Swiss-Prot record:
Residue spans of biased composition, Low complexity class: 21-46
Superkingdom of origin organism: Eukaryota
Function statement: Acts as a critical meiotic inducer by binding non-covalently to protein kinase ran1/pat1 inhibiting its enzymatic activity. Inhibits ran1/pat1 by acting as a pseudosubstrate for ran1/pat1 instead of its natural substrate ste11. Inactivation of the ran1/pat1 protein kinase is both necessary and sufficient to divert a vegetative cell from mitotic division to meiotic differentiation.
Biased composition (Polar residues): 1-20
Protein name: Meiosis inducing protein mei3
Name of the gene encoding the protein in the UniProt record: mei3
Annotated organism of origin: Schizosaccharomyces pombe (strain 972 / ATCC 24843)
One of the record's GO molecular function terms: protein serine/threonine kinase inhibitor activity
Amino acid sequence: MSSQNTSNSRHPASSASALPNRTNTARRSTSPRTSTGSSSTNTNTKTVDHAGTTFISSTSKRGRSTKAGSVHSVPMKRTKRVRRTPAQRIEHENKENIQTEKVYRIKPVQRVLSPSDLTNELTILDLFHVPRPNETFDITDRVNNTSR
C-alpha cells in the first residue's frame, strides 16, 4: 500500500478524482483478507508483440497489473544461423534427385543381364541354329539394341 501512495505522489496527474479505482483499492486493503500477514509481492511478466519487441510489466499477487517503473522495450535477439525445417530438407533432397535423374536420362543405361536372360538367349539361338560370328557373340549389345 505504501508503494501506491508513493506512486500517487510521483505522478500528480493520477489523482484520486481521475482514478476512482484507487480509492476502492484503499478500502479493500483494510479488509480482513489482507490482515492475515501475507505480503503482496509483484511478479514481472514478459510479453512479446508481433514485431518481436519484449515488454516487461508487473502483476501483483492479487491479480492487479501495475507498472514496474517504466515499461521497457527490448528487441529480441535474432540468430544468424538458418535452421531448416524437415519440409525444406525434403524439398532440397527432391531437387537433388531430379538433377541426378536428368543426368541418367542423358546417358544410356547399360542393362546387366540376369543368368535367366543369358540362358534364354542362348537356347533361342541354339534352337534356330543361327551362325554367330565373333562380333555378335556379345549378347549385351543385342539386348541393349546398340548394334541394330
